[in-house]
Amino acid sequence: MNMKLHGFLIGSDIQVDIDNKRLIRISSENSYKVLNLSAVVLKDTVMKLLIFLLTHASDHVVSNEEILQKVWEENNLSSSNQRLWQVVTELKEKLSLIGMPQDFIINRRGEGYKLNSPRITPLYYKQ
């Protein structure tokens, strides 16, 4: 039985849906039992970067060089530090639209990037 990565759960209320390139947040206000739903769609490279960071940068800093190699070059895309900065900025903007804190992605100047999240859970399904 093969297991395939479907996405991730960040904290308890944000789901990363890889196949549909979506981030979905479902939060509730307990006093009124109201559910709030917010969702954003990500471009291909932005989603690839997010998947890479969720997989590799939750417990240590991942170098810019490693990110450029794995996210850009291994997907036959042209890589540069400027392009990395642009895509990280776009990802941070999308994350903020669904209520993620600005410091979810931390840039360690001269080193690389790390995620600031207490709980990232990969979600798999049977093929």
Regions found by a protein language model. Give the residues of each.
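Short, Lys/Arg-enriched N-terminal segment that forms or immediately precedes the first helix
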Residues: D19-S38
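DNA-binding patch around the recognition helix
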Residues: N2-N20, V40-V41, Q86-K126
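Short amphipathic alpha-helical recognition elements used for nucleic-acid or partner binding
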Residues: V34-V71, L91
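Alpha-helix N-cap and coil->helix boundary residues
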Residues: V61-S63, S79, M100
